[in-house]
């Protein structure tokens, strides 16, 4: 499984090896070149041997960043994650320009139960631009998505997987991870119960078909999912997301069925509320959102506040809207949607200076495209 092993081909993706400067035609240079060549040759098949050779080369030139990064890759292959992280960190301290090095460090940290730091380093690598091979990028993005799913950040997990839709991916791990997103199931992919795995697999297959622009196949797969597993948690929610673009009333019915079957399914409550806002029934939305607020994870309370603010705006309750949207802004200050609606609330209340300030903040954050700015529910078209 990705994240537990590091394919040999990926070493070539880690960096573009640039030999350090050493005086030409010296014993040290000749010895260094010999050690680095032998280490490179051993890297895929004999990582233990490669590590020792790289260490000898680094004794000659300790500031050789690429050597530290290759040691980190070899240690990762051997599942010596703490040592791998240390070696990668040394290499990146010397040469922080290697995007794939940051991504690999994130993969290594993810095996040390340091999810926050792992995600930070993976994102840094992504922002710099992962390059070299689709399989490497897939491994990185799938692992990041799995970490996010465990904390119920299904929106960000989907954002990690979305770029992979343009590649000819046939890896089952991609579909499994997509299945957990579609079902809004916050579990470790390795801990899926045997009886649940078929549900996750089929949900992932359907969601992946939809994401890769195969709507007919997705429709058939979602119908199969619903027919086979009508009482499994998340199934009606997943089908409701699929229906949003074509039949919003049917989607609403699916979300309501999900809540009936699974009263703790807060994503369905948020979906119901967002549809109710669109349908012009903010009072009903407020009721749904207060119910969701009681059970949603802490990192999703901001979304409850945001939609409560939107509902209050529609109900011409500017004071209530401002209170809710200010609460959302405190939790996610870099979210452009929050600043957009807060500007509207201030404008409705006649607070022009505050409205102008929030509009400017919205424009700034929108340009930066904060990853929290497009929740999964919104990305499926529930609210704009």
Give a label for each model feature.
Residues 30-60, 77, 198-220, 224, ...:
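Alpha-helical segment of the N-proximal tetratricopeptide repeat
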Residues 31-32, 65-66, 99-100, 133-134, ...:
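Helix-start (N-cap) detector for alpha-helical repeat units in TPR-like alpha-solenoids
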Residues 43-53, 77-90, 112-124, 151-159, ...:
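Structural signature of tandem alpha-helical TPR/SEL1-like repeats
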Residues 60, 94, 128-132, 167, ...:
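Structural marker of alpha-solenoid helical repeat scaffolds
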Residues 70, 104, 139, 143, ...:
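Canonical tetratricopeptide repeat
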Residues 110, 123-128, 142, 146-149, ...:
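TPR/TPR-like (Sel1-like) alpha-helical repeat modules
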Residues 170-208, 213, 344-384:
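Terminal, low-structured helical/coil segments at or just beyond the last alpha-helical repeat
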